[in-house]
Amino acid sequence: MNSKYKVLKYKSNNTKNIDDLISIEEPLEITIKFKNKETWTENTISITMRTPGNDEDLVRGFLFNERIVEKIEYIDKIESVGENVGQYNLKNKIIATINNSENIDIDKIKRNFLTNSSCGVCGKTSLDSLEVIKKDKILKSLPKIPHEIIMKSPTILRENQSEFSKTGGIHASGLFSDKGDVVAIKEDVGRHNALDKLIGYALEKKLLNTSNQFLACSGRLNFELVQKALMSNIGVLIGVGAPTSLAIDLANKFDMTLVGFVKQDSFNIYSNKERIIIKN
């Protein structure tokens, strides 16, 4: 499932406005319904960010792979519930009714997904908790980043990844000055963990100066990375991969500049192009 977004594309000293297809990212709340002694009870066990479609298969596989059910036959039914919500008019909650609840330990299940390291959003147990706490928009005046600095930053990020050079299986987040100087770089197997490490380090060392800094991340740009960057008033977030629909929507809502598909001679600006200085 995808949607068209307006994008300013830079390539080889030329810019043009294009329509770009963006993968849709939406939260899915997974609730299980089971018999606790003689009483039917419902518990939300996880939220996962997903591309809508095949949601029943996703939930079925999730319940089996995590051994919440030992057999698929233990799932009586899976149904989408609630109102259609959001920009894409989707149901974002599913209830799975389980007919064999002997081995269900709801407290253990919740603990497991609250500490899930692969997705920081997945552990939250209410769609409401995804709402961004931040109230104020980012000032549009700063920072101003030359386009050549944008294109160089992924290479600099990679060159400073000590663990990636050894394993090839790790993400990085980097804080750069508007001159292209490295302020700090941190690595982790999870994109959101790498960004948390970076922000934590920058705060501890008092390195944050958002009026002349930007963030660069390996991989794609999703809702959670934008949300984390917003908490520190980061005005420009760039990535070597594609952004999701929710990432673009959130960046637009708070006046963040989001730049994706950054290569040595090209990039796409998805929101608030004014912060990127393009010299033809």
Stretch-by-stretch model annotation:
Residues 1-178, 182-185:
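Intrinsically disordered, low-complexity regions enriched in acidic/Ser/Thr/Pro/Gln residues
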Residues 58-63, 73, 109-111, 136-137, ...:
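Surface-exposed beta-strand edges and their flanking turn/coil or helix-capping segments
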Residues 62, 117, 123, 196-201, ...:
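A signal for specific C-terminal beta-sheet/loop modules enriched in small/flexible residues
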Residues 158, 170-210, 279-280:
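N-terminal-biased segments
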Residues 176-177, 270-272:
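Short beta-strand-to-turn element immediately C-terminal to the catalytic PLP-Schiff-base lysine
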Residues 192-269, 275-278:
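Feature captures the catalytic cores and cofactor-binding loops of soluble hydro-lyases/lyases
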